[in-house]
Regions:
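Nucleotide-activated chemistry modules centered on ATP-dependent adenylation/adenylyltransferase
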Residues: 2, 13-212
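Intrinsic-disorder-associated, low-complexity terminal segments enriched in Asp/Asn/His/Tyr and depleted
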Residues: 6-8
């Protein structure tokens, strides 16, 4: 009996998952002309397929705000790859600070969490909140993030955080699940075409050390 209840509960959780890719398509259909969108990019390779898809409907500007990336040399290397992508697609860019100290303060008590554990949503929120704030200050119609392209990132969590910070700052968050429609596969193809460096860990040294 208990096993049947457990299976039922797990099936309910699966059923409750929101199709954020479908929600994005619905929002795009409602657009009255091109809108401005601030895209938080976690790295150049992930941004490729996201920009390719969004650029058809939005005037995209990328913000590269990733204080979780360590060490600083790695941050700069990934930023350099990001600039290659922006040049390819002719995308505007907003420079942002490397607030690694703030990231460390927010996550130090979660340093022993595994990659994909409780530390990750804190990191997502830090980056999405900054993006929403900048989007509001610069009168963007929408903001969103490339984070959902990764098969290792939970799009349900990312979109819920995006929605919450969007409501906080009064700017529309565009729901996404860029890994859908073979988005991740497309990012690999575009990365090869552009000869991009693809890192082998997400960003923070906590996660890198846990994965080694």
């Amino acid at each position: 009996m208990e096993m049947k209840q457990d299976i039922h509960l797990r099936s309910l959780v699966i059923e409750m998952k929101i199709n954020y890719d479908a929600l994005m398509e619905e929002e795009i259909k409602k657009l009255d002309g091109r809108k401005t969108l601030l895209l938080h990019s976690c790295c150049g390779p992930c941004s490729t397929t996201c920009i390719e898809r969004l650029n058809k409907y939005f005037d995209v500007t990328v913000i590269y705000y990733n204080p979780n990336i360590e060490p600083f040399d790695e941050y700069l290397k990934r930023k350099q790859e990001q600039m290659k992508v922006l040049k390819k697609f002719n995308i505007n860019f907003i420079e942002s600070d490397y607030d690694n100290g703030d990231f460390r303060n927010l996550t130090c008590e979660l340093k022993d969490e595994p990659e994909g554990g409780k530390r990750c949503p804190v990191c997502f929120k830090m980056r999405l909140e900054k993006t929403a704030k900048v989007a509001k200050e610069n009168n963007f119609d929408y903001f969103t993030t490339t984070l959902t392209v990764s098969p290792h990132k939970d799009s349900q969590i990312i979109n819920k955080i995006g929605e919450a910070v969007g409501e906080k700052y009064g700017v529309k968050y565009l729901y996404t699940d860029f890994k859908k429609k073979e988005g991740y596969k497309r990012s690999i193809e575009l990365s090869k075409e552009l000869d991009l460096y693809r890192q082998n860990y997400c960003g923070c040294l906590y996660g890198k050390e846990k994965g080694e």
